[in-house]
């Protein structure tokens, strides 16, 4: 594994996981609000 590639990929993976986490949290709030 190239170190430079890892340095480039890390922020992208972090941003993607943060977005997925936020979307999941919003979805859970919407689901709990309905019931």
Curated annotation (Swiss-Prot):
Keywords, ordered alphabetically: Chloroplast, Membrane, Photosynthesis, Photosystem II, Plastid, Thylakoid, Transmembrane, Transmembrane helix
Membrane association type: Single-pass membrane protein
GO CC aspect terms: chloroplast thylakoid membrane; photosystem II
Stromal side stretches: 24-35
Keyword Thylakoid listed: yes
Positions on the Lumenal side per record topology: 1-4
A biological process term (GO) from this entry: photosynthesis
Disulfide bonds: none
Transmembrane segments: 5-23
Gene Ontology molecular function terms on file: manganese ion binding
Subcellular location as annotated: Plastid, Chloroplast thylakoid membrane
Assigned protein family: Belongs to the PsbY family.
Function: Loosely associated component of the core of photosystem II (PSII), it is not always seen in crystals. PSII is a light-driven water plastoquinone oxidoreductase, using light energy to abstract electrons from H(2)O, generating a proton gradient subsequently used for ATP formation.
SUBUNIT field: PSII is composed of 1 copy each of membrane proteins PsbA, PsbB, PsbC, PsbD, PsbE, PsbF, PsbH, PsbI, PsbJ, PsbK, PsbL, PsbM, PsbT, PsbX, PsbY, PsbZ, Psb30/Ycf12, at least 3 peripheral proteins of the oxygen-evolving complex and a large number of cofactors. It forms dimeric complexes.
Name of this chain's protein: Photosystem II reaction center protein Y
UniProt organism field: Cyanidioschyzon merolae (strain NIES-3377 / 10D) (Unicellular red alga)
């Amino acid at each position: 594994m190239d170190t430079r590639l890892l340095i480039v990929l890390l922020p992208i993976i972090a941003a993607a996981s943060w977005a997925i986490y936020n979307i999941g949290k919003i979805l859970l709030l919407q689901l709990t609000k309905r019931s």
